Amino acid sequence: MVKNPFSFRSAPVTFWTTVTYLALLIPIIIINEGTPPAPSEESPIRGTNLTQAWLDLSTLTRGYHPYNSHYNDDLRGSGSDNSEAAVTVFDDLSSNCTFLMSSGVAPAPNTPQVAAYFEGTNILVYIRGKSDDQGRWWDTAAVHDSKQNEKGLTLYFTRSENQPERGIVVMLNNGEEDYLYGARALGQHPLNPYIHTFLNLEGAGAGGRAILFRTTDREVTAAYAGSPDPFGTVIGSDAFGLGFIRSGTDYSVLYDVFGQRGLDLAFFKPRARYHTDQDDARHASKGSLWHMLSASIHTATRLSSDTGDTFIGPRSDGASGKVHNGSPSDGVWFDLFGKGFVLFGLRGMFAWSLTVLIATPLILMLLSYLLHRADKYYLFSSSVKPGDQPDDEALPVGGWKGFFRFPFALVVAGSLTIGAAFLMRKVNPFIIYSSRYSVLAMMVSLFYFSFWAIMRGANFARPSALHRVYVQIWLFILGWAMLVAVTVAEDRLRIGAEYMFVFLESSVFLSLFIALCELFALPKKNAWAQKMRDEQEERDFHRGRLHSPLSSSQIPPPVPNQESTPPGTRHSNHTASTPTIRNEDEDDDAAPTERTPLVGGNADPTRTTFATTYRRSISALVTRARRYSDSDGAGLHHDPFEREQAWSGRLPSWTWFLQFLLLGPFTITLAAQTALMLVDAVHQTGADGSSLLMPYLIAALGVVLLLLPLAPFVHRVSHHVPVFLAAVFAATLVYNLVAFPFSAAARYKVYFVQAVDLETDANRVCYHGVEEYVRAVVDSLPSASGRDVDCAGGSKKAGLVSCCFDGVATPPRLTAGASGGSGKHEEEGYGHLVAVNASRTGEHAARIEIVANNTKACFLEFEKPVSGLSVHGSSGWDERFGQYPDAGVKNVRLWHRRWDEKWVADVQWKDAEGEAASSSSSSSSFSDGDWEVLGDEDLRKRAEGLKGTVVCMWSDANVPGTIPALDEALRFVPAWVAVTKLSEGLVEGRRRFEV
């Protein structure tokens, strides 16, 4: 007989669950690790040239090109004439901004902050839309017409057949990497008020798929939804909104400050190559380039094709000073296998969540009530009486068996998995940096095996047919409690990242509904108890018959003779249907007749023997069985599975498969995609000083969610899979504990800076990172051999240490990269690199003039905060980024667009009593300490002065020999190390001043 392939037995459960997990996880991993293949043709979309775009990327990454480098200028001026239609190019060499530099953490009250002055060099390309006004409707300052020199996205829209419905502005942003300076400078450009939506192409990694990092609302996300290969989830958007991700992109300025609506499309891995010498075309792929380009073209086309009022009209927040681009709505979105894209409104999910919260418990309670009325609610029943008599003995039902197994198993297995995360953090915290799949495999195998062992062991000791339904009840309770928090977050915080829990609770409800409906197939509890009592009585009867001689009291009364007497016979006075029954009151000594036998007596002709008595007892059993079957419809030929409760034989054996389909595939897909995306995003952030525990906790929680759909069925999984996973756990645990965490493919990033004292010519080379690995880097450098290496905290990056040594063997030649510069002047000292002239312009006011050689960036650091700041040439303080702080500013970052140009900054400060003085000294007050002796008896009142330091940055390392310490590092550090800059400059030159 062929067994049901979907029955709830060990072999089918093991097969279907294992196949389902493998069929889902393998393609998800492949999609996560790969990129869509690049088209073989040169122009896969008419108007694009993938080959030319790849060559442009190769040119762009041929050298280091930060804002403060000569190669940046070279790239800005390069281009070729490839457009079919003229475009308007705004070569912005006039916009500048002075603003407050906010941080990801709100500053404490009365804490001095940081300000910046930046001169932009953005290039904006305006592509006229079909519905745009004709003519030059903008302010024509800084416009160069018909410079057709942009490629990629710009080239596509400049073709006549691809002209957008509404105009598009393509901004080639310069100065983004250091502090989003280019986007801030856009705020001063005349085109900015006309920009309603944006698509920001970003890079937080060096390849892979371009992820939809975050979006402002549902409507702009809909423009991305039809992309050929969508990739991303709303979780990233909410993580930014809640402050879990502190790094910023241009999105932060365009949306938060200017009020524009749009999207962030970004490369986000591998993080280890980001901002290193491997952040180039060689370590990228055409597939990555095509993935971003195709998504960009589709999204920009959809945004510019909206001719309605979706992105036009009054703002819903009523904010003044921001573009009027309509009323957005919050959205929830995620991709499926890199091909499908799900998008719906947050308010819709809130309504759905509220419905699930309220309706599902009521439905389940109603179903439970119906089961109770039908006397088939075996859950939570310990015993049942076979009758209504008080003296009836209650029979055990076993309805509580399996109730407490799931929470115990979940706590133990979850604790072991999270404990493994803490173990990794303690013993080998960076192993996830290069071996994230080994860590994930360890956690999956640990949770699976430990959870299975507890559930299988409990079911072996006390088999229960209610095991599955109890697990689903627990899942429903936990999911319902989680959904309460999710619903509050949806309504109050406008967060949609918890969509997975809404889907999970909905599927758990449907699965539990089916599980409760299964109970209708069971016999009534009272009927089952009556049957059990009858069977027990029969067993007791047979036990007595087999082990003791028959007595008259044990022998059932004889069955009446059914033979009828034919009419006209001797006993013809009886009807044919009337049995001949012996009258027990008759006299046994009746007078004999001539018919009386010679031997024997006048006994009843119906004789009782052992055989007839046995046949009569069997007949009684069959009669009772038929009566039980007729009363409930449940036969006696459905045996329970193994040693489960006797009443459970009628439970359907195939419904588990339907429940698994509801619980498994969709939840597994969402959990796997989300866990991989989050682990990919954070597993290499430990080198930046971020939490080393967080990646492991994310992996552990992702594993728990991934395997949770298996919980109701895991006790029927055979031992083969768990034992194999136990071996996997042992192997991966040993590897994760002892393996070296870095490799040439996943290099540890150390942060380099060389600090030069421009007054004493002393210089120190510093590497920032985790001390254990930084010391290994320093030990590999010839210039550090035999020198004292000081490692201490206080790094600009939290959680890292700074290891420094004397850089006398590798002095920088900071003018070598300049036009006509040779760097020979540095042999005589560094004093000529920066000239500072600080002079008083008032009692508490001063003018600081700075001239620096071969750099565009110099910073001011004051010992006490300044209450006023004005930079010559500035367009004024931009209050869109925050008002000037009452506590003042202690740091000012100054950026020029041209080399060797003078900065002039006027500053004011407050006296000891906290009042700013005017230009007249008569309004000042002084304490005794402000008097100093100028002669024998002459005293003069002196106002408080201002001390500070000018720090200039050099970032151009394209010419070998400019920064020998960096050249040495790139040549001699181990293959598992990548060197990148600590902050804005590779070399920092410091000069003090006082007024």
From Swiss-Prot:
SUPFAM superfamilies listed in its UniProt record: Zn-dependent exopeptidases
Biological processes, Gene Ontology terms: proteolysis
Cytoplasmic side: 1-10, 371-402, 459-468, 521-650, 715-721
Vacuolar-side segments: 32-349, 424-437, 490-499, 672-693, 743-995
Enzyme superclass (EC): hydrolase
Names of the cofactor(s): Zn(2+)
Compartment(s) of residence: Vacuole membrane
Keywords attached to this entry: Glycoprotein, Hydrolase, Membrane, Metal-binding, Metalloprotease, Protease, Transmembrane, Transmembrane helix, Vacuole, Zinc
Membrane-topology descriptor: Multi-pass membrane protein
Entry keyword Isomerase: no
Enzyme Commission identifier(s): 3.4.-.-
Residues that hold Zn(2+) 1 according to the record: E202
InterPro entries in alphabetical order: Fxna-like_M28_dom, M28_fam, Peptidase_M28, PFF1_C, PFF1_TM
Main location: membrane
Glycosylation sites: N49, N96, N837, N853
GO cellular component: vacuolar membrane
Site feature: Transition state stabilizer: Y274
Pfam families: Peptidase_M28, PFF1_C, PFF1_TM
Amino acids binding Zn(2+) 2: E177, H275
Region (Disordered): 538-607
Positions of transmembrane segments: 11-31, 350-370, 403-423, 438-458, 469-489, 500-520, 651-671, 694-714, 722-742
Active site: E176 (proton acceptor)
GO MF annotations, alphabetized: metal ion binding; metalloexopeptidase activity
Family to which this protein belongs: Belongs to the peptidase M28 family.
Protein name (database record): Vacuolar membrane protease
